[in-house]
Amino acid sequence: MRVLIKNGTVVNADGQAKQDLLIESGIVRQLGNNISPQLPYEEIDATGCYVFPGGVDVHTHFNIDVGIARSCDDFFTGTRAAVCGGTTTIIDHMGFGPNGCRLRHQLEVYRGYAAHKAVIDYSFHGVIQHINHAILDEIPMMVEEGLSSFKLYLTYQYKLNDDEVLQALRRLHESGALTTVHPENDAAIASKRAEFIAAGLTAPRYHALSRPLECEAEAIARMINLAQIAGNAPLYIVHLSNGLGLDYLRLARANHQPVWVETCPQYLLLDERSYDTEDGMKFILSPPLRNIREQDKLWCGISDGAIDVVATDHCTFSMAQRLQISKGDFSRCPNGLPGVENRMQLLFSSGVMTGRITPERFVELTSAMPARLFGLWPQKGLLAPGSDGDVVIIDPRQSQQIQHRHLHDNADYSPWEGFTCQGAIVRTLSRGETIFCDGTFTGKAGRGRFLRRKPFVPPVL
């Protein structure tokens, strides 16, 4: 199958040009002008549009069981929503397994979840929920099997202590894997939460007050120092929500430490005032939404290159689940927001169309750097001969208002309801096949492929 995309502006992280793009058998074969492919071929007119590499979202939680609830998006509805929003690859953070389980236990479970449902290509981050010799010995074997990143938690049920973190950092570094971490100070959060609950303060706003930015920033600083102690182990901070943590990361980067960081659209565009609305439970996630001052600091990091990746942390619990389980108590509410369908459009509208970032920087944040950090480059995150034919076409002339009834996830609400975006996703191709066009999804469950990722190689800092 041949596809010729004509008359668009093709954008990669290192530049853009008005040129045509030829995809054959799912692979980019040629870029340039006056391309004359062999018949037959499909021609797509991208006049006036940007032609970007398909998005790579390296932080989703599909089909996750958090003990009190299971998220309402599985690998079909989640990847369907992703591709309708211009994302053609996801790397899912697997949930915790049973107490004492092997490291690969969850990989086997999650490959079963995704195998016959994923619409687009996918991989997983390993999850380290306890440390012993057997777990450490499994790490290099899993890297050989194509899992080159693993997640640690400093909070929740399976949080690691500093000694366990050091052991994990060392073995992951030795094995060619990247350590990712959810950084929040669990003891400080538990103390604040208990204080509020004892006083009967259980409204949504106390979720944010129980997890102040200092809890996140302290844990970021601690992880940076532990990574240095562990032999300058590479480190990736997930879902950054505040400027103080970013300051610590800037300092580490200035000292040439291999650290990288992602943020999410919710921390750039939503703020803590959402907790005081009638539907405040809709916005329970961790870290919580911050104030507008913190948003501004994150936008500075987006603009000046201090932030490397924009992902989503898509973790969908319906409003019905939230209300039934929480019964008005923030501490009982399952955490997470939907957003995998909105990431590309929101960042394009609020970033590119406002002049905060260039189209090239948009590519770097949404596909190129995620692919480089997580062992998918140059197969993903790039439009060049030999790369996969993963493409998203965005028309900057179109304006759209986000309405949940038009979205493709399995939630019953959107935190972005009513947001007006300048720029519309008009077509998404996965390996050369159009599976979203002008509002219509045409993909099929099970067409996505598991991606064996290469061992971690640090991009130049």
Swiss-Prot record:
GO terms for biological process: pyrimidine nucleobase catabolic process. Substrate binds at Y156, S286, N335. A divalent metal cation 2 binds at K151, H182, H239. Carboxylation allows a single lysine to coordinate two divalent metal cations. Pfam families: Amidohydro_1. It is an enzyme of class 3 (hydrolase). Transmembrane segments: none annotated. Binds 2 divalent metal cations per subunit. The modification N6-carboxylysine is found at K151. Its EC number is 3.5.2.-. One of its GO terms (molecular function) is hydrolase activity, acting on carbon-nitrogen (but not peptide) bonds, in cyclic amides. This is D-phenylhydantoinase. It comes from Escherichia coli (strain SE11).
